[in-house]
Amino acid sequence: MKKIQLFLLQFLLISITQHTNAQLPVKTEYTVEMGGTSGKGTYAPMWLTANRQGLSSANTENGYLRAGIAHTMPLNQHFSFSAGLDLATAYNFTSSFIIQQAYADLSYRWLNLSIGSKERLPELKNSKLSSGGMVESNNARPIPQIRLEVPNYVAIPGTHKWLHLKGHIAYGRFTDDKWQEHFTSIGNPYTIDVLYHSKSLFAKVGNKEHFPVEFEGGIQMSAQFGGDQYIAGQKEPVIDM
């Protein structure tokens, strides 16, 4: 086993929140970030690539420059709108230009419609752990999707705030077609144009106004479907789904 010596250099250059109107919760946030690794060995260790929302490289020599903007504004008493764009240019990544986030959200009270790629933390899991998740985790790039969700717990009427629910349903598309085609060796299968589906339902039982303990649990499902399967080196698909 080769000994890996690796050093991490990362700077958070700018993190600015600009309130454009003191009377309204309008917020615009700009971020600029630069990071890099330098060392010897075959691969970068997992603890330098985990919990990065996929913005990392397995190469021991790599770097990136990242810039983003996010804007949130109310439309009226019940509706609000938010959007964000987060781009990166990288060295020794799988791509030299990365659209990390590009999304628009429309919210009505507790219901939210999200379109695009957006970083999200896993449910019911400590996001600071590097072990990932059984279904999804923050070790992978955000998947472009249309997502209808109740992102925060909502008290169910008639339960006196003892039962709360949240959940989502989403459909999207994977964006690794070029990587699949380039990475797969001749004679082996790969699939492109793969679609994505996920849904979840979580419940919280408890009322801290009357009892200090709460119980939380739920179900979550993610699936791949559709797509066309090819054999590397051949032009025609072997399975057209």
Protein language model features and the residues they cover:
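Bacterial Sec-dependent N-terminal signal peptides
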Residues: 1-26
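Transmembrane beta-strand segments of Gram-negative outer membrane beta-barrel proteins
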Residues: 23-65, 75-85, 167-171
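Short loop/turn motifs that connect adjacent beta-strands in outer-membrane beta-barrel proteins
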Residues: 23-28, 71-82, 94, 107-111, ...
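Outer-membrane beta-barrel translocator domains and adjoining extracellular loop/strand segments
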Residues: 42-49, 94-98, 125-132, 177-186, ...
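Extracellular loop and loop/strand-boundary signature of outer-membrane beta-barrel proteins
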Residues: 50-56, 86-90, 131-136, 184-189
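Signature for the C-terminal beta-barrel architecture of outer-membrane proteins
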Residues: 149-241
